[in-house]
Amino acid sequence: MHVPPSVPGTRARTAHYTSGVSTQPARKSSSSHVEGARSPRIGVIGGGQLARMMIPAAIELDLDLHVLATAPDESAARVSTHVMLGRHDDPEAVTAFARSVDVVTFDHEHVPTGLLHALEHEGVVVRPGPNALVYAQDKLAMRARLSELGHPCPRWWRVETEADLETALRESGGDLILKTARGGYDGHGVMRVEALEDARDWLERGQPLLAEERVPFVRELSAQVARRPGGEIATYPVTESEQKDGVCFRVSAPAPNLAPEVAERARTLAANIASDLEVVGMLAVELFEYPDGRIAVNELAMRPHNTGHWSMDGCVTSQFEQHLRAVADLPLGDTTPTAAWTVMVNTLGSTRENLAEGAREALANDPGIKLHLYGKSVRAGRKLGHVTALGSDLEETERRARAAAHTIVTGDESKE
């Protein structure tokens, strides 16, 4: 299947903001086919930087990208020509938005699964579908399903009571990582637990929790794949990520000194998970690498992911273009790197209120870096943008990327 053009229409030159209200029936369709001569409409729920970075790729593919944002100053809403305002958990807003597009996809995983099932029942095309997306939304469901399928995971426990946690602590040797089953991101919703008292506040909330053994990993890897509705898959080089206070800070592509057989296992694992869960779009499989070369799944994301931002400048086909190709059921693109090494460094929350001066300095210092700012207000620890550097020498390429990011957020030209 593919997404041919549909009814005649023209693209707006300025943003159109509409409220999330509609009395029109849902477009009844079991595929992404649209009729006529207009460009296919791809609807992205969420107005963050991931939706923002899909826009250039949508233009190149002649896709009309529509965004459901909560406010006109969100990252994607600031630059999109088709914006509807409404919350991702408001059934009326989401339904109205879905009825205005041909395919629905996501900037984040937080849309209620029941709402997405209702949309599919009405004939809305949702990619990835709720039966797949639930495994990126609910960590307990993810662990249970991946374990059932035989994919490598850390040892884990479902925790709902103090007795459950005491059992997990005893069986793990008294050292656990406790996670909220839903909603955690960038270090939020995660804590180390060595005694029952450490987690009493979380237990009192009455929500199921995921407890995992504390993995003795040597580093974190990410394997990204894209999958079309018919099953075609494209894999990306496996990357290494560095975290700072639970937030992705640096990504190196490909992962340095990764044994070829480990890289192949990681790519095969990601492809198998995409097939087993029937994911459509991008899938990022975050992995732990053990000292002996074993790998285990950490988390899943069914959308473009921070560990794939390097592909915007360092790959023939970026993850953002690839995601749109997949959800629009277009042939997938080449994932060959365009340089020996690509290093991406996030620009995280700054003491500066405006990054423009630092960005100008960074660009002047190194004309070879690529800069991507998200148009977001400055807040401590917040992802405000990223820089990428490409080169033939890994150490020098990483130095350049780190220096540029440091200059942007501090104005200091010295190496971080």
What are these model-predicted stretches?
Residues 135-222, 226-273, 401, 405:
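Active-site nucleotide/adenylate-binding loops and adjacent lid/helix of ATP-dependent enzymes
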Residues 264-285, 291, 301-352:
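Active-site "cap" helix and flanking loop/linker of ATP-utilizing ligase/carboxylase catalytic domains
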